Amino acid sequence: MTDDTTKNGPDATAADAAADATAYVENETAQQEPAQPDPIELLKAENGELRDRYLRLAAEMDNLRRRTEREVKDAKSYSVAGFARDMLAVSDNLRRALDAISPETKATADAGLSTLIEGVEMTERAMLSALERHGVRKLEPVGQKFDPNFHQAMFEVPNPDVPNNTVVQVVQAGFTIGERVLRPAMVGVAKGGPKPAEAETNSVFDEKDA
């Protein structure tokens, strides 16, 4: 048997078939295995996700800080609201006592009565001053355009000399605390006069800003 016969025999055919099968399996395996992702792209995606998460967390913390500051401010400003509202009844009684004394009585009062009147007036001023130090301010609506946010109309007064719907009388004083109405002023408003001017009216808080 020659060398060519040996090379081309059954063994050679089997070897070639095995090699072909191995190559086929390797090729199929390579096709089935997914391509590996780029690690740099993975890091970029992870970095973007972490950045978005950080920005959301920072925004939530900022909102929480602002909300907490607002709640603390409101708590300080309005914590005395209940007590102040009770003190308004005392202030009302002092004012009624002073209003019950006619100008003639004041003018002819003896020393004892004059001292008593002065004491009541001083007490009223001291109370209003103490309330104002805690953010409670008395409204002065006479001459202002009626504002349902701050005033409660009790009656109308026919008066053609002042603009219609102008506050001309105060029955019970109104008060604010901070930017809220603690108690609206009970007022009488003018009726029958000209319409109020469209010009911008002064806010009840202008005195505070002045």
From Swiss-Prot:
SUPFAM superfamilies: Coiled-coil domain of nucleotide exchange factor GrpE, Head domain of nucleotide exchange factor GrpE. Residues 11-23 have a biased composition (Low complexity). GO terms for biological process: protein folding. It is found in: Cytoplasm. It comes from the Bacteria. Keywords: Chaperone, Cytoplasm, Stress response. GO terms for cellular component: cytoplasm. Signal peptide: none annotated. Residues 1-40, 191-210 are annotated as: Disordered. InterPro entries: GrpE, GrpE_coiled_coil, GrpE_head. One of its GO terms (molecular function) is protein-folding chaperone binding. Belongs to the GrpE family. Homodimer. Participates actively in the response to hyperosmotic and heat shock by preventing the aggregation of stress-denatured proteins, in association with DnaK and GrpE. It is the nucleotide exchange factor for DnaK and may function as a thermosensor. Unfolded proteins bind initially to DnaJ; upon interaction with the DnaJ-bound protein, DnaK hydrolyzes its bound ATP, resulting in the formation of a stable complex. GrpE releases ADP from DnaK; ATP binding to DnaK triggers the release of the substrate protein, thus completing the reaction cycle. HAMAP family: GrpE. This is Protein GrpE. It comes from Rhizobium johnstonii (strain DSM 114642 / LMG 32736 / 3841).
